[in-house]
């Protein structure tokens, strides 16, 4: 079965490398217009060129409300909307036992891995999907199921 996403738009956080980049490339190859976000502009620019199909990018901190707003507004104005939101950006600043993690690392992990996907989803819904429908994909890893 061939995947067709003609006429659809996708916004992929953490889309400049790894799973996010692969998802963005798969969507673009299936005909979707794609925006990727990530922290580093140079990495975003290279990834967008490799993804192809007119992929656009917006560099910024996934947890920054101004970045969220700017990326979503740009996706709507330049690509026509946000039919698919992929919350892929994640961090794991500390891979040791939880009891040894310091509070700033813990807060960063919670902010990036839990608060940011909630905020992106809420903002996309308020700005676009509420009246147009859509799909939200939240990506996670086995790290969310294992303890140390």
Spell out what each predicted region is.
Residues 9, 16-17:
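Conserved glycine-rich cofactor-binding loop
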Residues 30-46:
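Conserved glycine-rich Rossmann-like NAD(P)H-binding loop of the short-chain dehydrogenase/reductase
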Residues 121-122:
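A short, exposed helix-loop element centered on a Lys and neighboring polar residues
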């Amino acid at each position: 079965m061939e995947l067709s996403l003609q006429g659809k738009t996708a916004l992929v956080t953490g889309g400049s490398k790894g799973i996010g980049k692969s998802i963005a490339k798969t969507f673009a190859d299936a005909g979707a217009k794609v925006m990727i976000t990530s922290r580093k502009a140079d990495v975003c620019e290279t990834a967008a060129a490799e993804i192809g199909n007119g992929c656009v990018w917006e560099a910024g901190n996934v947890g920054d409300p101004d970045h969220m707003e700017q990326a979503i507004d740009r996706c709507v104005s330049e690509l026509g909307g946000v039919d698919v939101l992929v919350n892929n950006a994640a961090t794991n600043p500390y891979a040791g036992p939880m009891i040894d993690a310091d509070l700033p690392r813990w807060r960063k992990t919670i902010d990036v891995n839990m608060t940011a996907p909630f905020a992106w989803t809420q903002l996309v819904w308020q700005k676009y999907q509420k009246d147009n429908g859509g799909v939200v994909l939240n990506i996670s890893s086995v790290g969310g199921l294992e303890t140390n």
